[in-house]
Amino acid sequence: MKKTLYEKLFDAHVVHEAEGETPLIYINRHLVHEVTSPQAFDGLRAMGREVRQPTKTVATMDHNVPTDSRDLGGSGEMGRIQMVELAKNTEQFGVTLYDINHINQGIVHVMGPEQGLTLPGMTIVCGDSHTATHGAFGALAFGIGTSEVEHVLATQTVKQARAKKMKIEVRGKVREGITAKDIVLAIIGKTTMAGGTGHVVEFCGEAIRDLSMEGRMTVCNMAIELGAKSGLIAPDETTFAYLKDRPSAPKGKDWDDAVAYWKTLHTDEGAEFDTVVTLEASEIEPQVTWGTNPGHVIGINETIPNPADMADPIERQSAEKALAYMGLPHSIKLTDVAIDKVFIGSCTNSRIEDLRAAAAVAKGRKVADGVQALVVPGSGLVREQAEKEGLDKIFIEAGFEWRQPGCSMCLAMNNDRLEPGERCASTSNRNFEGRQGRGGRTHLVSPAMAAAAAVHGKFVDIRNVELH
């Protein structure tokens, strides 16, 4: 029987499956953070249970951590309590924790891959919707709720229904200046934010293969934003080169055996998908969102659509509401729109390649008057590498704020947030109402586009900006 990559991964992890029941699957790696885990550990404690396989669970602090200090209380009392509880729970149950002062601390979806905790063929879960990031390695990775976090801690398994299969092929090569963020935003613009509902998506095509692992993580990170359960990219030599010699990656003969297995993790020729979507890479422009979901997106040189031109009444009403919230008229270009803040970071775009791309724009320039610009590395190791390369100095000299690792302004759960009415060019993954702060207006862009907006005070076409 011909199988897709998703089917191979799912079938390899089924522990129990009976007619009329949701399959029970084994979980290879469980990533934990401070927000969705406290009640799960409390549940174990109440029932007198242990963590079944502590070595397969790794925790870090990310959502609530302040990025302007390493003070546990720096983001408020609730954040402090959650981080203190995580430290207490991981110590009691024997789980590895990268706390706020550890060099490996960082956003969970940055920390996992850079430590080699994310490997092809694995099932990976976390109490966070952007767990799909790890699918870039050919792992079946998806977010779970707190009750499921407890179930995985107790049993190393979770109930999971089979999803429909979707293939998204990006044909050909992208043009100069087009990034992974532009690719995935263009995909969501085509599918809409609900186009992948009920599916696991496999991304493929020459443009996807050409991406680095960091670019592939950006693409899979946002699979959830088109409604999918998870995103996948088949592992290849790019994957293996990234993983080799990572701390938790196999070594010696185990590495050779692992690679031999990983090479089988691809969709069989002739395997069938329920849904197929294709894009031409050469047609993708630098992308900017204009509304309140990632599907509200256009190329930088396009005009904001007129809701009156939308045939679907629900789509039309959604667009009207989005434009009212964003304080924008239809039929203008986003190059006419000034911004107040810039956020370069998040589990989508806070890795070293992202910071290099932003620094190439910032070098020798200054942040525009009246604009606050934050650069927040995704982990302690990313920050350390950036400082070795002198990127921090480039940002600081240009007027950007160089911060400590954390989720930061991606979500309003710490001190980095927008004030009502403020407009932000952000490299994060969600532009929902209030996502970055009550009344805040978020535009999703690539790191280079965000840096260009910071120095020009408005959105510009990155292809017209000289890079240093």
UniProtKB/Swiss-Prot annotation:
GO terms for biological process: L-leucine biosynthetic process. Keywords: 4Fe-4S, Amino-acid biosynthesis, Branched-chain amino acid biosynthesis, Iron, Iron-sulfur, Leucine biosynthesis, Lyase, Metal-binding. Its EC number is 4.2.1.33. Its cofactor is [4Fe-4S] cluster. It catalyses: (2R,3S)-3-isopropylmalate = (2S)-2-isopropylmalate. Binds 1 [4Fe-4S] cluster per subunit. [4Fe-4S] cluster binds at residues 347, 407, 410. Pathway: Amino-acid biosynthesis; L-leucine biosynthesis; L-leucine from 3-methyl-2-oxobutanoate: step 2/4. GO terms for molecular function: 3-isopropylmalate dehydratase activity; 4 iron, 4 sulfur cluster binding; metal ion binding. Pfam families: Aconitase. PROSITE patterns: ACONITASE_1, ACONITASE_2. The keyword Ribonucleoprotein does not apply. Catalyzes the isomerization between 2-isopropylmalate and 3-isopropylmalate, via the formation of 2-isopropylmaleate. Heterodimer of LeuC and LeuD. NCBIfam families: leuC, PRK05478.1, PRK12466.1. HAMAP family: LeuC_type1 (MF_01026). Belongs to the aconitase/IPM isomerase family. LeuC type 1 subfamily. This is 3-isopropylmalate dehydratase large subunit. It comes from Glaesserella parasuis serovar 5 (strain SH0165) (Haemophilus parasuis).
